[in-house]
Amino acid sequence: MTRILEIGGRRLPFLRWSVLRMLLGMRGLTRNWQVGDGREEALAAHVLAHARPGDLDEAIRVIDDFCVTRSVMMNVGDEKGEILDHAVQRVSPGLLLELGTYCGYSGLRMARVMPEGARFCSIEFSPANADIARRIWAHAGVGDRLTVVVGSLGDGGATIERLCSEFGFTDGGLDFAVVDHDKKAYLPDLERIQRERWLHPGSVVVADNVKFPGAPEYRAYLHAEEGRTWRTIEHDTHLEYQSLVKDLVLESEYLGEPA
C-alpha cells in the first residue's frame, strides 16, 4: 500500500495497515478509548524522546511524523487541524472547551493559536489518555495553559459541576468548543451545553469525524436548526493521515435562542 497523496505540502499515505488496525479496533474504543495495541503510550514516549522540550511546534511536528511513518492515531490530524486552527484564530476565544482529549494533539494546536491568557479545558473519559496528554503538554511547555478533566458531560452532572465550580464556566462564558469524542454523544452533549446556557451568540463549535465514523444525528440536528439557532459550514476533508476515507468537519456558529 504505497500510493501517496500530497496535502498541505505533506505527502500522506493513501491507506496503511495501521489505519486498518485502528478501524478494526474501534469496537473497543467505547470501553477504554485506546486502539489496544499500545500506540498511545508509544506516541508519548516518542514525543518525549524526539521533540525538544518546550518547543510546541516541534511537538506537533513529531506527532504528525509518528502518525505518518509509524501508527495512525485518532488525532484530528494535520489536514483537519488546519481547519481547527483557522476557526480558533477567527474566534479569538477567551474560554475553550474540548470534548475528547485523546493524547492531547488538538490541545497543542489550539495552544499555538489561542490568545495569550485564554483558558482551555478538555474533558477525557480515559484516565490513561488524560495522563498521556498531560505528559505531552508538559513536555511541549504548555502544561500550565491546558487542563484535562477526567469525566464526561453525561456522567450525571459531576463533570458539569466541576466545570462551573472549578473552571469558571458560566452563562454565556464559553466562546469555542471542539467535539471529538464518542460520536453517539455529540448531540446529547451539545444539548447539555445549550441547557447550561454556556454559549453566547457568536460562540463556535467544531465537530470532527461527522462523516466517518459518523455523527448523523448531530448533523441532522444542525441542518434542522440552520439559520435558526445555528449557522454551519461543512468542510469536506479526509479521515486523519490518509486519503481514501472521506470525512466532514462541521464548524457551527451559535446564533442564540430564537425569540
Which role does the model predict for each range below?
Residues 72-158:
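SAM cofactor-binding core of SAM-dependent methyltransferases
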Residues 110, 133, 137, 160, ...:
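Hydrophobic packing residues within well-ordered alpha-helices of enzyme cores
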Residues 4, 183-259:
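C-terminal substrate-binding/active-site "lid" region of AdoMet-derived donor-dependent transferases
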Residues 116, 139-144, 169, 197-199, ...:
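Short helix-capping segments at alpha-helix termini
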Residues 35-37, 52-55, 69-83:
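Conserved SAM-binding loop and adjacent beta-strand
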Residues 58-69:
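Conserved class I S-adenosyl-L-methionine
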Residues 1-56:
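N-terminal auxiliary segments of SAM/dcSAM-dependent transferases
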Residues 146-213:
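Active-site segment flanking the S-adenosylmethionine/decSAM binding pocket
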